[in-house]
A protein has these predicted regions:
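Mature N-terminal segment immediately following signal peptide/propeptide cleavage
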Residues: 32-56
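Bacterial N-terminal signal peptides that target proteins for export
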Residues: 1-8
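Hydrophobic alpha-helical segments with strong N-terminal bias
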Residues: 4, 17-18, 27, 177
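C-terminal segment of classical bacterial N-terminal signal peptides
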Residues: 13-23
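Cleaved targeting-peptide boundary
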Residues: 23-31
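Catalytic glycan-binding domains that act on GlcNAc-containing polysaccharides
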Residues: 50-263
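A general secondary-structure boundary signal
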Residues: 13, 45, 59-60
Length: 263
């Protein structure tokens, strides 16, 4: 797997320089306009310093219909908490999380010492996102993000991630053939490109690096050592920053508490 190595400060400065765009490429809602959008976007990216080789990789992508289908069909976040927990296999995640907390105790102790984040929420996120690494996705990351940047629903949001992905490819931190989930997330805990630039530590296909990076993300979003992370408690806001879906946030908090020894 391609090694992911990052220099945070310079990356974010460069990413800021890449946007916003004064003349955005024309978005669309079907495959028909994707080729024309790529041509227009490529000109913008070239003007912002993206390399010819990376632009060629972008131009080689195909419209990711599976990504669009998945984006349109995210119904699990509309379930009740109990329904969501059952659908996502919460009892299995908690049981496996407890095992890993015990077997990988030194790793989690090190992470908690550095970032203040206990094992529970990290293991809950890991289990929820990829089944502890068993389901990391098999979509082309660049095609997925480019398709979503072209799609009119959230073009501005995914355009930022597309520029981040192009930057990571330019630097050799990601390969144009990188595989990931439907929305372009990569690694054991499913980082988007902008988050990789800001919080990524080493190869995110490696569990220890991904968990460390996840703890770094949570700390950067206000996690305080020793404070609670259930709804209404100080650290719940950091979980909210990880994923915008309320039912997901509550599930992570509940499973994390159970893994950490609560009920």
């Amino acid at each position: 797997m391609q090694r992911l190595a990052y220099v945070f400060g310079a990356s974010l400065v460069l990413l800021a320089a890449l946007g916003p765009r004064a003349h955005a490429a024309q978005c669309g809602n079907s495959a028909g306009g994707y080729a024309a959008w790529k041509q227009e976007f490529a000109g913008e990216a070239r003007a912002k310093g993206v390399s010819t080789a990376t632009i060629q990789a972008l131009m080689a992508t195909n419209y990711a219909q599976a990504t669009i289908n998945a984006d349109r069909g995210q119904r699990s976040f509309q379930l009740s908490l109990d329904q969501f927990l059952a659908k996502r296999g919460a009892s299995t995640i908690v049981a496996k999380g407890r095992q890993l907390k015990s077997s990988q105790g030194a790793l989690f102790a090190s992470i908690q010492s550095r970032y203040g984040v206990p094992p529970g929420p990290l293991l809950a996120i890991w289990g929820m996102e990829t089944g502890f690494g068993s389901q990391r996705g098999n979509q082309n990351m660049l095609a997925s993000i480019a398709t979503l940047a072209y799609d009119c629903r959230r073009s501005a949001y995914f355009t930022e991630h597309l520029y981040a992905a192009l930057q990571l490819i330019d630097r050799g931190a990601l390969s144009p053939s990188q595989r990931g989930s439907m929305h372009g997330e990569v690694g054991q805990t499913q980082f988007m490109p902008k988050a990789i630039l800001a919080y990524g530590t080493g190869n995110l296909e490696n569990a220890a690096n991904a968990l460390t990076s996840t703890a770094s993300f949570l700390k950067a979003h206000g996690w305080r050592a020793g404070a609670g992370y259930q709804p209404g408690e100080p650290n719940f806001a950091a979980i909210q920053a990880w994923n915008a879906a309320g039912v997901y946030q509550k599930a992570i908090a509940l499973m994390g508490r159970q893994i950490d020894g609560g009920e």
